[in-house]
């Protein structure tokens, strides 16, 4: 129900689907208007006839759409939300349900997390209004053998990718946690001498305790194991190493050289969600796929076409995104639905390939009580 004040015009949204075999040029919709007062019977006031012009175009189902929808998934959060063991069979049943729904919307990317806390829990440790655990954990089970060598169990990562493949939503496989990790200063960086705060927890079989990789030799060995596993699985052409909102092009270039050294002659493809003009100007040659926030999209509107051509010519995708800003348009709980509706229209207007959003299924501690976070 909507409260409509007297004498004020009221808009309302009506959504439906025209059958594919509809052959007419026009469709007439009749909208019946009723009124009632208190406990009186409803009374029909009028019928509003709305003529609709029907274009001779059949849209593909969303899961077959060329629109590049890139909503980042948070599988660890699902285990917490439903109070099940991380990477257990029941956890993957829940993951399956969520990915099936996401795929029906036209999702094109599988989020694969290969280190611990790449976003440092979205700084949830600083939020007191609605305290929530928003940490994401490594899909790879890591250990160090008695011989001092790093070992990896890829079962959970492979299983996640397999589910995404089942629903045809892994056109791209984005690896989070290897580049552009957050909060090196306040959340810490365990790897001595490495400028990107990669946090990889492992079980030391010799000391029988959990530790974090703290040197570049072990880090290089670990990254090499992850990337070579994906190469051996025949997935390499779909893999991107993604950096979320990097702002230091020198550090990114240095880390890219380090990562490249772990896979020999294989070409590594990189992607960034970019919100920094300096990074956009100075690092776009190193990036194969890119998403730029709405502010940068508008600021660089005159150059968008050439940037898109540069990215597309490398076989990449150029999208745009919103995050915790701007206030409008966005997809907050408080955002009017029409702001979500215009995402596709904006994408068409800007001439971009699609849209990115970072917070699919990132539930607060008790979403039934308060599903809003920070805002």
Region annotations inferred by a language model:
Residues 1-13:
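Surface-exposed binding patches on compact interaction domains or structured appendages
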Residues 9, 24-26:
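Coil-to-beta-strand transition motifs
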Residues 17-20, 27-37, 46-265, 273-284, ...:
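Aromatic-lined carbohydrate-binding surfaces of glycoside hydrolases
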